[in-house]
Amino acid sequence: MSLLKVDNLMFNYSDKELFNGISFQLNQGEHAVLVGQNGSGKTTIFDLITKKLTPDKGTIEWTPGVTYSYLDQHYKVNDDFTVIEFLEQIYKNLFDKEKHMNELYEKGSNPDDPNYFKYLDQASLINDELLRDDFYSIKEKIDKVIVGLGIPKEYKERKLNILSSGQREKIYLAKMLLEEHDVLLLDEPTNYLDAPHVKWLAEYLQNYPKAFLVISHDEPFLSQIANVVLHLQ
């Protein structure tokens, strides 16, 4: 199934023709990389398909309902969050369910309450939902990703604003990986990674069950993760 279709895309930048009739599509499960010389417009393609820029001609169509995570090189967030607060935002609806479940268990702590069994039954149903959504492995999942990208687990309680720019970029990348949207759009994801963490990311993306489109100057990295190569002339 096609997730994204780009057809006959034309775009001029500062009176210079950048694209003249580019067409491609990204299908479900494809691991695609976008390659081309410096200045060929790879990042501009991302700005166009994420609607930061508008093409002069042509069409860009996302299949209705498809979601994507976009990691660009200028990602900004409220850096007053701690690392764990920032990453747990991804699962806010599940943590809200857990809070409600605990409130029900507290209400159901008195066997003499006429609603005792009602509270416990409702709490049990919520717990079943949390189990189905793998809620109880979230903290382990977060640890695996941040450590894989080179962030020690003890940094989870640190605020983003005291981390280095490279460490923040790793946390932003971790968020994209954990969100598990239909499509990952990654622009230079290895910029701040040491060799062992580039290796970890390559293995993670090799096994990624959904689609992605990646830009990188790291050719060995691209060759490890790609099953589709899109060339910008």
Question: Model-flagged regions — what are they?
Answer:
Residues 1-233:
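ABC ATP-binding cassette signature C-motif
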